Amino acid sequence: MSAKHVLISGVVQGVGYRAWLRSRAEALGLSGWVRNRLDGRVEALIAGDIAAVEELIRACRTGPSAARVDRIEEHLDTDPITPGFEQYPTV
């Protein structure tokens, strides 16, 4: 089990990025959450099988077709994770 906190920068809001990420995470059997930030980035916590977590982070480098990802910051996370994947409001 692995958990990573990621911040995604670029043209990532208003392009369906959160819904895309949630759908991909659920398809991979991952848990966590995703939300927009007021600073224009998308933030996510992704947890599950390490290979699936890394696969999703690789996919996040491209994102949905309307997105343009400039940068992804990722850090290991050790907080307890609730099963399932949620899409939260902007913070």
Curated annotation (Swiss-Prot):
It catalyses: an acyl phosphate + H2O = a carboxylate + phosphate + H(+). Gene3D superfamilies: 3.30.70.100. Its EC number is 3.6.1.7. The keyword Hydrolase applies. It comes from the Bacteria. The keyword Repeat does not apply. InterPro entries: Acylphosphatase, Acylphosphatase-like_dom, Acylphosphatase-like_dom_sf, Acylphosphatase_CS. Residues 3-89 form the Acylphosphatase-like domain. Keywords: Hydrolase. Coiled coil: none annotated. The active site is at R18, N36. Pfam families: Acylphosphatase. One of its GO terms (molecular function) is acylphosphatase activity. Belongs to the acylphosphatase family. This is Acylphosphatase. It comes from Granulibacter bethesdensis (strain ATCC BAA-1260 / CGDNIH1).
